[in-house]
Amino acid sequence: KSEEVMNWWQNIMPMADPDKTDRTMLTRNRVSRIFFLRKFFDYPISMKKETFVNMGFCNMMKAGFGYLWSCVHKLPETSLENFYINRFGRPLYEMFFEGYTEKVWGVHPSKLGADWGSQRVKGLSILSVLKDMFQKAFGTKKDNQHVETSLIEQFIYPKYGPGQLWETVASDVKQMGGEVLMQHEVIGVNIEDDKVVSVVAKTTTGEEVVFPCDYFFSTMPIKDLVPAIKGIDVPEQVREIATSLPYRDFITVGLCVKEMQIKNQTAIQTYKNRVPDTWIYIQERDVRIGRLQVFNNWSPYLVKDYENTMWIGLEYFCTEGDKFWNMSKEDFIQMAIDELVKIDIIRKEDVLDACHVKIKKAYPSYYGSYY
């Protein structure tokens, strides 16, 4: 979406032949679908025959009348719930947005601000979906830079995943004489005369080290940055809001499997008839998994034995300290496997290997002191 960012990415990792160099970006097709009622739906929802068949006649009629009602009875956009209802109608909101949104944020959409919806789906609505369908049918669709985020069909991706981009940047910094310090927790940002003059970091041994600086760029969560500021009086209200900002934490389980039970039923040709999806949004209410990534489709170079195995990532949203966060690695992996077996995506005996990764403060939340 940003030409400046795209140019920077491709300056670091140009679009070269992946069979000749590792330092390259791949152009990938974005295929994201919704898994609901043990069936696949396009993401965003399309007006195809398969959608109506999978939805069923009664649900289809409810969705149609619900959308028409929402066109003439607009709700005040004081919440994410009203934001979605205004664009899709209540029945579609309840089918495809309500449960999943609560899964992601741990809060009902009626208690979330409309800001997140305006950023995530922006101008997306039933009308924009129909417009996109007609543009594709008549060959007048614009490039990805000028379409809604949820309608983008291609993206560029590092050969070995996003971590490779930052490993490459770190390598370039070192080659130019710079130093990249790992396992240093920033605990202080010292300011003099309205300028950051030094940063205090704590090492894994507990030692505190001071680094004088001319420039300071922060990617810290605001919740951690504001309390670390020294040398100026941060207004109490600002400090209080910053330290109480809510965040959503994240756990991902990686599974190496022989195969997936779900197969490709699209017109897209795939290896061994595997599903073409990069992301699958799991809308089923009887499991806690939120999204499923199929890494073979992000980059075939991510999977050592691409021909005979699939590498998938199960995404769970939680809060640090809750029962999911505190669950042992072994128990969590077993729960994740059981959930995919339950919804007929894999077989237990096909699991070859697994890993478990926790990520704190993965997403800032749009409620509480955010307002």
Model-derived features: where do they sit?
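Mid-domain catalytic core of redox enzymes
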Residues: 182-312, 317-326, 330, 334-344
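Flavin (FAD/FMN) cofactor-binding core of flavoprotein oxidoreductases
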Residues: 322, 333-371
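Surface-exposed helix-capping loop/turn segments at secondary-structure junctions
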Residues: 15, 77, 86, 175-180, ...
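Active-site/ligand-binding neighborhood in enzyme catalytic cores
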Residues: 50-51, 60-189, 197, 212, ...
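Dinucleotide-binding Rossmann-like beta1-alpha1 core, especially the glycine-rich loop
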Residues: 1-71
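A residue-level signal for conserved active-site and pocket-lining positions in enzyme catalytic cores
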Residues: 38, 84, 101, 169, ...
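Short glycine-/acidic-enriched loop or helix-start segments at secondary-structure transitions
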Residues: 9, 52, 191, 227-229, ...
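Non-transmembrane alpha-helical segments in soluble domains
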Residues: 6-10, 81, 85, 170, ...
